[in-house]
UniProtKB/Swiss-Prot annotation:
Tubulin is the major constituent of microtubules, a cylinder consisting of laterally associated linear protofilaments composed of alpha- and beta-tubulin heterodimers. Microtubules grow by the addition of GTP-tubulin dimers to the microtubule end, where a stabilizing cap forms. Below the cap, tubulin dimers are in GDP-bound state, owing to GTPase activity of alpha-tubulin. Belongs to the tubulin family. SMART domains: Tubulin (SM00864), Tubulin_C (SM00865). One of its GO terms (molecular function) is structural constituent of cytoskeleton. This is Tubulin beta chain. Keywords: Cytoplasm, Cytoskeleton, GTP-binding, Magnesium, Metal-binding, Microtubule, Nucleotide-binding. SUPFAM superfamilies: Tubulin C-terminal domain-like, Tubulin nucleotide-binding domain-like. GTP binds at residues 11, 71, 140, 144-146, 206, 228. Mg(2+) binds at residue 71. It comes from Cicer arietinum (Chickpea). The gene is TUBB. InterPro entries: Beta-tubulin_BS (IPR013838), Beta_tubulin (IPR002453), Tub_FtsZ_C (IPR008280), Tubulin (IPR000217), Tubulin/FtsZ-like_C (IPR037103), Tubulin/FtsZ_2-layer-sand-dom (IPR018316), Tubulin/FtsZ_GTPase_sf (IPR036525), Tubulin_C (IPR023123). PROSITE patterns: TUBULIN (PS00227), TUBULIN_B_AUTOREG (PS00228).
Amino acid sequence: MREILHVQGGQCGNQIGSKFWEVICDEHGIDQTGKYISEGGSDTQLERINVYYNEASGGRYVPRAVLMDLEPGTMESIRSGPFGKIFRPDNFVFGQSGAGNNWAKGHYTEGAELIDSVLDVVRKEAENCDCLQGFQVCHSLGGGTGSGMGTLLISKIREEYPDRMMLTFSVFPSPKVSDTVVEPYNATLSVHQLVENADECMVLDNEALYDICFRTLKLSTPSFGDLNHLISATMSGVTCCLRFPGQLNSDLRKLAVNLIPFPRLHFFMVGFAPLTSRGSQQYVSLTVPELTQQMWDAKNMMCAADPRHGRYLTASAMFRGKMSTKEVDEQIINVQNKNSSYFVEWIPNNVKSSVCDIPPKNLKMSSTFIGNSTSIQEMFRRVSEQFTAMFRRKAFLHWYTGEGMDEMEFTEAESNMNDLVAEYQQYQDAIAEEEDEYEEEGEEQYDEQ
């Protein structure tokens, strides 16, 4: 079985993660004690349940999850929450001090003291796997623990399991809604790490999620619960092909191969259709064309970047439910033909589709969208501008240097982020003809040698 080991860190990561497990338990028919409920279920629920669960004694299913935080609060609320009993008690790893929204505390001081106990749990879980496919990490980049300790863990896992996939669900700071003043610092230092150590980053941000809740779901006062509901639907969609039988499968590695034309450009926008609010999973029966249309809609993207401002390098569409693959293919071709200016022409057929037969609970069919668009640079550019504004005056730096960080590290992170923006811009502007001329020149030089 191709197992995925799930890690959640910090307050944001733990809240998203616990929501995700509620969704996955629901899909696989696992109740709050970890037992499988057979009524109304089907064999397919158990067929590949090993991807996310370990089977323990007495027929209980235990999530392959590691939960970490530098303060006990969020963990305790998960533990006392509805699904708190299904996790392995040893897999809760937490400190008492908190990171105080300080990346340096998470990455170098407090987090570094706790990281070995987290890695022990990760190793134990990895040893329980038959054929570990990779890791998925939920965290935010604005705080201290998820960003600082999250990226520390990612780099440690990278060292120990270099050939396994590393997928992150990273919540970026929002443009208008700021939780803490030092978000731009924490986010830039984190991106510096993610560019090097992660294989695939799904970029999320609260503001875009709020917009979806307001505009599409018509919720007047969305809670984090509603936002996390959207994220968990997407997370479940990304891995459904591994967990349920399908006609066209995809896994984390296939996704990466199809989506990442250049190694550093692995930050994706995600979307989901049909969008339903948490309480009213209306029994909407959409058609494949409607799903496709909604999923490519800019309003559907879960990060604050507008795909119409850039071009898609690659994209992936994952459909769930009983549908004709021919229709799926036709729709995908249709999207590419109608919006050809939004796709780079030097990667032909750059949309991959996959179909999984089992839809999510209460839906006839659904689709998950993952796009590698150059417009994601808007997010990085925005954070980078805020970073530069503060860093120029060395504002708040003493909190970081006090934990032993060097200003040099800030400068490096800043230029790495700016390089990333420049790379996206370069490929956004690239056109097919120029590439050809370049290749011919290359060949001529080669002949001369």
